[in-house]
């Protein structure tokens, strides 16, 4: 993987670049649709390519390990061969899911024992077998296995957790370097900065990771209940230290406003389930604000869903989408998901254009309040 920094904004830390992988290029800043189990919920790959304009999607190691399982994925030639997506893929290590979805778990130095949320079966993740699992899945970008402490952890627990994450990272890197890709294309490993909301721990984590010389670096453990201003402060603290010549990935974030604020602070890559999850619940994001398509006000509004949006937005009307949600038709969730994902990709594409033009901050400030309004 190679990252080329192309433009930097004079008034902020915003920047544009290009990530080159063996499955294609990724223009940054970029939003990555989440395909937890190998698919983006409710959206066909054709629509992801042609309407959403997705350049890279995510898979999740925890979920793919449980279903369809490693034997199937290996026999298929990895996730690319299994699902037919020909562009880049990134896999999360499953750490967040192990520490959030599984109610019964035992954490120790070697790794984490947990029970499947599907059938209660017992499993054990270590840095080594997670690296092996991500090799089998075969994503272009692999995430290190880390401990994900609760967002409001006290300082002593956060410090202890960070120490564990750092030791696990060393083991991840060792295993990654000892193994080879399985399917004839290169893979990259991204470490993850943890440290909760403690500046000194975030700085320590960022310095530890910066010294590793990885192809890119991630910021984890944010957007888990802390105030947004605290999240932005943590991003600033970390990005002062992470190398500028490597892509920076803010995991699990967030709202359109969050993304623009993080771009201003030097973040390049984003993922979040919000566009599809909110879409399935009739909430649409637009430059004018958010729309609840179940509201009666849309009942006789025959204008396009978004006159500046993708093809789906132009084909269907607000009244029709309102009707579909009221009738509980599956098409409603599909249309809303396509719209929201296309909007998120348009947002980061527009941000990229304004960084290149040199007016990113002015543009961001002119739209950010409107983005959060309810229409």
Label every PLM stretch briefly:
Residues 1-20, 26-33, 41-42, 146-152, ...:
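C-terminal extensions of enzymes
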Residues 24, 57, 92, 134, ...:
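Conserved, mostly hydrophobic/aromatic
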Residues 33, 37, 63-64, 96-97, ...:
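Short, solvent-exposed loop/turn segments at secondary-structure junctions
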Residues 129, 133-136, 160, 164-171, ...:
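A non-catalytic, amphipathic alpha-helix used as a structural packing/dimerization or gating element
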Residues 152-155, 159, 216-222, 330-333:
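Glycine- and acidic
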Residues 163-166, 175, 179, 184, ...:
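Glycine-rich phosphate/ribose-binding loops and adjacent secondary-structure elements
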